[in-house]
Regions:
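Short aromatic-cysteine micro-motif
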Residues: 153-155, 181-316
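Short, solvent-exposed loop/turn segments enriched in Ser/Thr/Gly
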Residues: 19-26, 65-72, 87
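GGW-centered surface loops in extracellular recognition modules
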Residues: 96-160, 166-168, 245
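Enriched for extracellular/lumenal, surface-exposed ectodomains of secreted and cell-surface proteins
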Residues: 74-85
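Short, conserved beta-strand/loop elements in beta-sheet-dominated catalytic cores
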Residues: 163-165, 243-248, 252-254, 291-368
């Protein structure tokens, strides 16, 4: 008498790993006593911890809390009374990181507004403060946004910049930006906290001044801003505060702006307010100190000129012009300098693109 055919099913056919369940199980339902083996096709995400040959229970465990997917292939060998069974699979989803995104579709237009994606898909619009009042945002309590808190340090009042991971994707006329609160395959560490070749390595957080630099090049409230200076003067003056103090640069610019883009799903900064001095002349730092929320305008209306702040950074656009380091133009186009030790007005940069005239209508994603 020959051996009978075997039929195998797995219950459940998909499992999830996360911070609440770093291991998960499924049961292999088979006929007879054929030996069960199981292998993962992505051992950087999930691996087999154990197999109980009596009960058919397979235990799968996370690998270093890595977010991603894997497929477990189950094999049942020939047993005493049954033939070897056909392979079956179980899907594994490991979610230890939250991803927030926004996508713009410029196929038939050029709107500044985008559509929220990923974990932000169901979020409503933030409500920044008006007239120094209160405000709210669905991103409050979500890292890295919630980590942008004020601290008094050697450079004055500064705002903490926690590390995040990001990814730009371009498909035809669609542009997508995603920000994650942990490492994800295919994502990059933010421009400020990544290893910039300056000897500090990858950082967990950095800082940016809450205010424009005042006397002594520090970030101080109630003080007048440094104006009518060159970029190189600002560079040296700020760097004199300490070995790791640098003028706001191209990396800082994009660190903050990417957070804004995902939070507001809009390229229009005036969603917060019109940033401009109310008197057509500069006014001292600290105009937003009385604001009851980290983001908003001092004006009675968002359509009126006042003083603005975003995530505790005052004057991201208003009152005075800013120098930005770490970039320069030459005949070839825009050059970017990653290592702050190499900041220069005309050298040491990597060419990232050639701008065209007029307002931007599309973007490319540089690979440099």
């Amino acid at each position: 008498i020959g051996k009978a055919a075997n039929t195998v099913t797995n219950s459940p056919s998909s499992i999830t790993l996360n911070t609440s369940a770093r291991t998960a199980t499924f049961t292999v339902n088979r006929k007879g006593n054929g030996t069960i083996t199981a292998t993962s096709n992505n051992t950087s995400v999930a691996k087999i911890k154990s197999i109980n040959q009596s009960t058919g229970v397979v235990t799968v465990e996370s690998v270093n809390d890595t977010t991603g997917t894997a497929k477990i292939t189950v094999k049942v060998a020939e047993g005493t009374n049954y033939k070897a069974a056909s392979d079956t699979t179980v899907s594994v989803t490991a979610q230890f990181v939250t991803i927030y995104g926004v996508e713009w579709d410029w196929t038939s237009g050029g709107s500044t507004r985008g559509k929220r994606t990923d974990a932000a898909a169901s979020f409503g619009d933030p409500s920044p403060a008006v007239n120094n009042g209160s405000g709210s945002s669905p991103f409050d309590g979500k890292m890295p946004w919630s980590g942008m808190v004020k601290e008094t340090r050697a450079g004055g009042v500064e705002v903490k910049e926690p590390k995040y991971w990001f990814k730009w994707t371009k498909t035809g006329k669609k542009l997508k930006l995603q920000i994650a609160d942990g490492p994800v395959a295919g994502f990059s560490v933010d421009p400020v906290n990544r290893d910039r070749g300056d000897g500090l390595g990858e950082l967990d957080y950095s800082y940016i001044g809450r205010y424009h630099c005042a006397s002594g090049y520090k970030s101080a409230t109630g003080a007048a801003q440094q104006v009518n200076i060159t970029r190189s003067q600002a560079r040296s003056g700020i760097h004199n505060l300490g070995a790791n103090f640098w003028q706001m640069d191209f990396a800082q610019f994009w660190y903050v702006n990417m957070l804004f883009l995902v939070e507001f799903a809009d390229w229009n900064g005036e969603r917060i307010g019109r940033g401009c001095s109310t008197s057509n002349s500069k006014m001292n730092n600290g105009q937003t100190d009385a604001m009851g929320y980290h983001t908003g305008t001092t004006a009675a209306s968002r359509d009126s000129y006042g003083f603005t702040q975003y995530r505790n950074i005052e004057g991201w656009w208003d009152n005075v012009y800013d120098w930005m380091d770490g970039c320069y133009y030459n005949n070839n186009g825009l050059n970017v300098i990653s290592n702050p030790n190499n900041f220069s007005d005309s050298a040491n940069g990597t060419l990232v693109g050639t701008p065209s005239s007029g307002y931007p209508s599309d973007f490319t994603i540089p690979t440099a």
